[in-house]
Amino acid sequence: MVYSYTEKKRIRKSFGKRPQVLNVPYLLTIQLDSFDKFIQRDPDGQQGLEAAFRSIFPIVSNNGNTELQYVSYQLGEPVFDVRECQIRGTTYAASLRVKLRLVSYDKDAASGTIKDIKEQEVYMGEIPLMTSNGTFVINGTERVVVSQLHRSPGVFFDSDKGKTHSSGKVLYNARIIPYRGSWLDFEFDPKDNLYARIDRRRKLPATIILRALNYTTEEILDLFFDKVSFEIKDNKLLMTLVPERLRGETASFDIEANGKVYIERGRRITARHIKALEKDKITQVEVPTEYIVGKVSAKDYVDLTTGEIICPANMEISLELLEKLSQAGYKNIETLFTNDLDFGPYISETLRVDPSYDRLSALVEIYRMMRPGEPPTKEAAEGLFDNLFFSSERYDLSAVGRMKFNRSLGIEDTTGSGTLSKEDIVNVMRKLIDIRNGRGEVDDIDHLGNRRIRSVGEMAENQFRIGLVRVERAVKERLSLGDLESVTPQDLINAKPISAAVKEFFGSSQLSQFMDQNNPLSEVTHKRRISALGPGGLTRERAGFEVRDVHATHYGRVCPIETPEGPNIGLINSLSVYARTNDYGFLETPYRKVVNGQVTEEIEYLSAIEEGKYVIAQANSNLDNELRFTDAFVTCRGEHGESGLYRPEEIHYMDVSTQQVVSVAAALIPFLEHDDANRALMGANMQRQAVPTLRADKPLVGTGMEKPVALDSGVAVVAKRGGTIQYVDASRIVVKVNEDETIAGEAGIDIYNLIKYTRSNQNTCINQIPCVQLGEPIERGEILADGPSTDLGELALGQNMRVAFMPWNGYNFEDSMLVSERVVQEDRFTTIHIQELSCVARDTKLGSEEITADIPNVGEAALSKLDESGIVYIGAEVKGGDILVGKVTPKGETQLTPEEKLLRAIFGEKASDVKDSSLRVPNGTSGTVIDVQVFTRDGVEKDKRALEIEEMQLKQAKKDLVEELEILEAGLFARVRNLLLSGGFNDKQLENLDRTQWLEQTLVDEDKQNQLEQLAEQYEELRKDFEHKLEIKRSKIIQGDDLAPGVLKVVKVYLAVKRQIQPGDKMAGRHGNKGVISKINPVEDMPYDENGQPVDIVLNPLGVPSRMNIGQILETHLGLAAKGIGDQINAMIKQKQDVEKLRGYIQKAYDLGDGSQKVDLSTFTDEEVLRLAKNLRKGMPLATPVFDGAHEKEIKALLELGGLPTSGQIILFDGRTGEKFERPVTVGYMYMLKLNHLVDDKMHARSTGSYSLVTQQPLGGKAQFGGQRFGEMEVWALEAYGAAYTLQEMLTVKSDDVNGRTKMYKNIVGGTHQMDPGTPESFNVIMKEIRSLGINIDLDEE
């Protein structure tokens, strides 16, 4: 494998035995692709905005004289970039302009000649844009729109599994679900009649729908039944015989023909009998007259002389009726063929309970059901039924729905109309009856072939369409008002409903969520999440076990591990690593194609529907060098996802990778295969809660997924083009681009500005640190700067800690952990949290609020940290209660006492008509002010601080642009210099000239002269571009801010809080092994080994066996080996040993085991080997991919190479006594995470605070500064102790006895410590409640 310069800095040794066939795809594809399809820079009419416009336009007026046509749309460029939108609290969006054409026709002309055409561009609101990382910035906060897993449109056949009726009879039903429009259900009742429901309303006999479709009784019977014809001949009754239909029946009479008895009466008819009948070509057989009694006529029989119907279709035939028919001259009688086994008389029975008799009566019945209480007219009834399923405006199956519909009914063609046809409805009823007759099976709703993904783009399109429909109504009204001479398209369209619909979706839809920004992994996972909840989905309460369960079709599509614990379990899932959606929105996963037992290079993506037909081998099946299966029988998933053994030649496909089953978070757990699934679930979920530490530390034991996650999350800075680092500091990196990657005529310089100390959604700190040095070569796509929780471009959520599994004085009882003080001293788990506090000055009725340092009744000390504008200065250390922004609010005038009047007259007005409403630091918070931002409304005068900030921003912007210009100019002049030197000038001549004069020289060579002129033009362009950019920046900085109505000024203060680890903080490993820190122990008391090296954390060994997450033990052993090798390398470097020896040792470590990725150090230079060695000193990073990890013998060999005991256990000594512990202890390195459940955020104690209005009891919860509930069990405890007075105090003065509270306060102030309890308010509440029931209740106080 060839490594680039940066990759050679640190190479992770992989134990994976299977070669990587397919690279991990870009992890945010699902979001970006979906939104691209919605926006469509080059539109096609099938989807996105274009489709929405085309489905609504043209809008035609009611009289048909004018129409508004759609031509095209154009998206503008956003005014502010993403960063600016976040700071200003605005939405990152682009304006949508649509070209419309208003065409009016001549009324009189029958042909409808065009009278007038007006074309115009119309503004249609703002469309939020997706950032390059798959998020949206809405009102300044980053949000993610989660994809939804919903039931695919189409037709579904299901049964109630015998739960509806007491007899346990299975009732079948069919449901046609469109993409939008009314649902149509067909269902059997316990009496086997077929009913239909529209939109889950009252049921009607299903035949009403058929009659409404203009079918007669005869035609209906024709559609659903085979016929049996009887012939009356010489007073005998002959039946036409179809032998196959007799199978399984019992003969009710002797079946004979030509004097031969084929089947005796009472015998069961078998295949042998049928063969004999077919062999002798028997087509008619005589039957007794009684046989026809009870059969049902298949058509109307009319008396030809009178025209009277003797026997209507669907009537049971009796002997009298037979006589009548015979007399009327009918020789042939057709009846319906039914039997009890597999041809039920369902439709015939249903027709009998059907109240309708023709099309109109059926339409009226449907109208009455849909619109009860309204008088039906023919037109209304017809219009309603037509609009239900046959109008493309009201009903749409969509391409997916049509495809699923046709496939379900076995129709080859998967395309067709979006509305239903007569045939569609009849076919659905036919298939439902077939299923009831025992042919065919019901669908599995939880199969991923029946559930599809609806992503951002599609949901945004639907919302946009809803907005357009609202506009359409308004436009239609406007068009029918007449007076269209002066009207332009702009006058007709109001953009408000459109932008409101879109805004509502992005701002408050259940699926548009506040992005989880704890760390890069949580961002990536959030964007790859799939929810079954949300509009048009399930609800938590209604979802049963089946929906939440893991399904066979989840394999390689949805992760079986990662899902929340709690009420949402199984409803919110995560996409598997390699999964993607196809054009229809179904999830697909890749497989390697197998031909005749040999695996090919070809990779195919299969959806759940297609996969069911094939036999698929697992990724860890054994292959030889020619990619043939070596085993005689291979474990595979066969049809319907059942596992079994198959011969190699029967196999069609093979998995791509061992980690294709799991999601990104689960693929980051090493030795996942050794963990119980429940614990793995916790491990996957807890990695997302890890807080980025001060210094990121790559995991020693990883899985190889760390790099793709860090790269795709977008938190790190990635090189757009290859080149050389020309300049680097903490806030910017400049790259001189390689010649072959530059576009002709550009300066070839890329500048990357880094994000410094900004706040994330979860109040963690986002900071980028360069990881390249001056002069280093870099390639396109390589990491230039690490973001939060990334280390040299690898995900690093926690720290590698030296752990020991042993009890220690009960300090690790029940999952608690003992942590060494050294961990705190070295700041291993110190995290920075940034809080944003804002102060808003509003315009009130009594006057406007003012931000000032002149605050009434506040001492000097409290104002010491404010500047003259009343705003805290940057760098101030503040604690709870300190003033950050001074603000006063006008008070209403009150009646003044004479004394006050006198004071007013002497000391002037101002003092008392304002009250202090300053922004203070919340209790329990302390930190350093790192940034202040002031936003001022247009037209309001800016204060001194705002002007200072503005000036600073201008300076910074100018400095950035000037530096950028200098770098670009330097690059340009370097090329000019080379050109001039090659064109006959020498260094001395050039030194005497000013740089700008170089461009004015003339060269003999015409080609070079042209190049020089081009460069001169570029120089001018650069200058102009610089001026233009500076002007734009300046106008952006100076312009007033767009604030909410009534707001004059907003001041935002950012506090940075540094949190060290302390008892009560929650920590966890990656295997679901979580715990709370019980004690920070002095380093000298920690257990230590023979070399005097103490452990960092002591974990309880009892936490392992019952939880069955053995992965943590293997990780600990492997971590020890990795560290051991690092120590050996470190010793060699310290002893200044020969580079070749060092190279040999490192090569030996990389070669150990039978991993498929080999590292060849012979191609490295000595300098590269040394740099690699220096980076390996703290431990050699290892990768053990999921389900393809390190084996026990490899771990032992690695331990041996590191000079460590192969048992992984070490003799430890007690730090307090120096005595040896009685047996060796498992010691090693485990990757530990600090989770975002910090004791500082949870610790809370109430003093005097707010009370609930009705009950007058203290509120609950930290946010409300509430108390702890003294519930009934606590009351029992005090009762049991007999502590009557304590109990009385708890239930009265400490809770809701209002008078008692005030008396208590008086007593305490007065120095008498006694208590006078009164009546608790909750007692009054219950009295009032009883009175509200009409019962008079009084308290007799004796």
UniProtKB/Swiss-Prot annotation:
GO CC annotation terms, alphabetical: DNA-directed RNA polymerase complex
Annotated EC: 2.7.7.6
GO biological process, one term: DNA-templated transcription
UniProt entry tagged with the keyword Transferase: yes
Gene3D superfamilies: 2.40.50.100, 2.40.50.150, 3.90.1100.10, 6.10.140.1670, DNA-directed RNA polymerase, subunit 2, domain 6, RNA polymerase alpha subunit dimerisation domain
Reactions catalysed, as given in the entry: RNA(n) + a ribonucleoside 5'-triphosphate = RNA(n+1) + diphosphate
Molecular-function GO term, any one: ribonucleoside binding
Keyword list, A-Z: DNA-directed RNA polymerase, Nucleotidyltransferase, Transcription, Transferase
A Pfam entry, by short name: RNA_pol_Rpb2_3
Record's function text: DNA-dependent RNA polymerase catalyzes the transcription of DNA into RNA using the four ribonucleoside triphosphates as substrates.
HAMAP family associated with the record: RNApol_bact_RpoB
Family: Belongs to the RNA polymerase beta chain family.
Subunit record text: The RNAP catalytic core consists of 2 alpha, 1 beta, 1 beta' and 1 omega subunit. When a sigma factor is associated with the core the holoenzyme is formed, which can initiate transcription.
Name assigned to this protein: DNA-directed RNA polymerase subunit beta
Underlying gene: rpoB
